[in-house]
A protein has these predicted regions:
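Conserved NAD+-utilizing ADP-ribose enzyme module
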Residues: 2-30, 57-63, 71-233
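Short aromatic-glycine-(Arg/Gly/Cys) micro-motifs in beta-strand/loop hairpins
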Residues: 39-58
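Short hydrophobic beta-strand segments
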Residues: 30-42
Length: 233
């Protein structure tokens, strides 16, 4: 049985003969990179598993490693692009740096909204253990990013959150659909992102500025210092 046939069989077992209406198999290539983000920079391999962080209505029928075709998609799929930092939701003993893993894969699964209700929001793709060769997947760190600041603009009927992130990228990386960032360092402001109907738009709710390596290191140093003091600056 080929790798493709093994994957088809795994999907059929999980979702029945109508699986092709619920998921699409994607072939890996240099033009279809998939990314995974993590606070852990020492992951040697990714083993597909049943996630404990699923949106309401998301399929629990098959173990997988969740990825996205873009960094923002990973962040949205991660479930928080900033507010959790206000509530000390993450381990305060770490500097909460997000590491970007570019995944190695031959075949991936693009679920439909029937399986992942927010797939249009995150562009989630699954890496599935369908054979001996896909029991684990390798990823290479190609960049990192961290939240530097959260500003809040108070309005009459609510408030707007503005998240300032800094990224250092070792290779060309897709941040959102239609925006590939060249290797280098960037300051990215994400404005009031939230809700499945959110439409990211550069220049509107996403502002990207290329910065120097020295500028990145300066803000990274301040970030680590502020974490050690258990506060954001």
């Amino acid at each position: 049985m080929t790798e493709y046939e093994s994957l088809v069989e795994s999907l059929r077992i999980a979702y029945g003969d109508e699986f092709s209406k619920m998921a699409t198999i994607i072939k890996g290539s240099e033009n279809t990179p998939l990314y995974h983000i993590s606070f852990d920079d020492k992951i040697k391999s990714f083993v597909p598993r049943f996630s404990t962080k699923l949106v309401n209505g998301e399929s629990r029928a098959i173990p997988r490693t969740s990825t996205s075709s873009s960094i923002l998609g990973c962040m949205l799929g991660f479930g928080d692009i900033g507010r959790g930092y206000l509530n000390n939701a993450f381990d305060s003993k770490r500097d909460n740096t997000l590491y970007i893993y570019k995944m190695g894969y031959a075949l991936a699964v693009k679920p439909s909204k029937d399986l992942v209700p927010d797939v249009d929001y995150t562009d989630e793709h699954w890496l599935i253990a369908a054979s001996v060769n896909t029991r684990e997947y390798k990823g290479q760190i190609t960049g990192k990013g961290f939240l530097s600041n959260i500003s809040i603009d108070l309005l009459r009927n609510g408030c707007i959150y503005n998240y300032t992130w800094y990224f250092s990228l070792d290779e060309k990386t897709k941040f959102i659909k239609g925006l590939d960032l060249e290797p280098g360092c960037y300051c990215i402001n994400l404005l009031d992102i939230g809700g499945y109907d959110f439409i990211p738009k550069v220049g509107d709710n996403i502002k990207v500025e290329k910065i120097t390596k020295d500028e990145f290191l300066f803000h990274e140093g301040r970030r680590i210092e502020s974490i050690s003091n258990k506060r954001l600056y």
